[in-house]
Amino acid sequence: KKKFKIKDGIEIKIKKNVPAGFGMGSSAASAAACAVGLNKLYNLKLTDAELVEFAGIGEKASAGTIHYDNVAASVLGGFVIVKTKPLQVVKIQPPNDLILCVAVPELKVPAKKTKVSRGAIPKKVSLSDMVKNISNASGIVAGFSQRNSELIGRSVQDVIVEPARKHMIPGFDKVKKNALAAGAYGVTISGAGPSVIAFTDKK
């Protein structure tokens, strides 16, 4: 309000179809909606980068932490790569045949689920595991660059965070095994979970 000299008070109600606490960026979606809505309401003429920055501030207010990757995707749509310090957002176009399937389990999400999920991540990792994850992340980017859905999906392999968190999702290993057997190229935890996301194509 101070930056833009807005004197009005405002009450915002958001109706969305993103369940809170299921690893799908619910708080980021709310923050992005507020940033985009206020930009239009007050004709602030913010750039995409500014919208992402302010949405990040909004998410910190609601969720306690900024997730620029989540708010950037919510503001810009599609897929993004985010660099920080300084903040830089790169939007990337997916292959036309890429399909993502999200399974949302009927679970009662515990209080402070994201904080608990973060606590499960190891503080130290082996060099070999780090190399594997960086290699797979590079494979995902290469898949987008080549518009190759299979390469993207087969590169969705996480040997650090997924093993540390999967015990919090009942039946995760069985769901992943069955999805891969059904033709998915890759399966992993969506965000901090407990939703599970599978990557495939129109074949």
Q: Can you describe what each PLM-predicted range is?
A:
Residues 1-18, 168:
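Helix-rich "cap/lid" substructures immediately adjacent to catalytic or cofactor-binding pockets
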Residues 2-9, 38-54, 86-88, 203:
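Phosphate-handling active-site elements
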Residues 16-25, 58-66, 123-128:
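A short glycine/serine-rich beta->alpha loop
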Residues 26-48, 75-77:
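DPxDG-like acidic metal-binding loop motif
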Residues 48-98, 187-189, 193, 197:
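Alpha/beta catalytic cores of group-transfer enzymes, especially the acyltransferase/condensing modules
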Residues 84, 105, 198-202:
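Short beta-strand-to-loop capping motifs
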Residues 102-167:
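Active-site rim beta-loop-alpha module in soluble metabolic enzymes
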Residues 144-203:
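Glycine-rich, charge-dense phosphate/pyrophosphate-binding loop(s)
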